[in-house]
């Protein structure tokens, strides 16, 4: 199926979360998510990053002041992400695909997830929250101090790296406008 001309087959994102959606259902590989995005703004085939994973809207309907949309998730995606463990009611970081002329305030994020990091520790650090994570060994060479990472779709700067462990800081706005404020080690 060809996508509408305003969408390319290679969508990119910024890692700046624009909504926190809610998983309202899933059956097999089809997931349904409620969002504040207007239904009319999401044509079938539109790319939406769901916790950083680029997924294509299959069906879209109005839902209150926002929308509910479905996405199909492949076995490959389930093997590289946390989507297989999602339960109804779960909050999901959402971001629409970047369009020409949009502000690029985070960093270029492909939405192609390479693996899952594990939260080891979270502790206050001034006005921010310091998070220590561990990633799979095969990804360690790609994480560098002061480099960018996307975690649950959120663009973050790496503070330090030690082997497979790395740290980031979450500022207050990130904690309130993403799902990061609800996470625990």
Question: Where on the chain are the PLM-derived regions?
Answer:
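Conserved loop->alpha-helix
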Residues: 2-185
């Amino acid at each position: 199926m060809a996508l509408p001309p305003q969408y390319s087959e290679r969508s990119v994102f910024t890692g700046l979360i624009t909504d926190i959606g809610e998983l309202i259902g899933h059956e097999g590989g089809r997931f349904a998510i409620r969002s504040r995005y207007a239904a009319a703004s999401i044509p079938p085939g539109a790319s939406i990053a769901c916790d950083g994973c680029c997924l294509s809207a299959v069906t879209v309907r109005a839902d209150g002041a926002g929308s509910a949309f479905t996405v199909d998730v492949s076995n490959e995606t389930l093997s590289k992400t946390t989507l297989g463990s999602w339960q109804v009611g779960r909050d999901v970081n959402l971001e629409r695909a970047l369009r020409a002329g949009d502000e690029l305030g985070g960093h270029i994020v492909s939405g192609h997830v390479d693996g899952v990091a594990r939260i080891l520790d979270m502790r206050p650090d001034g006005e921010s929250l310091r998070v220590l994570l561990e990633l799979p060994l095969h990804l360690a060479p790609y994480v560098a101090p002061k480099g960018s990472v996307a975690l649950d779709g959120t663009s973050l700067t790496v503070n330090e790296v030690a082997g497979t462990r790395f740290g980031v800081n979450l500022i207050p706005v990130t904690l309130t406008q993403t799902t990061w404020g609800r996470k625990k080690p």
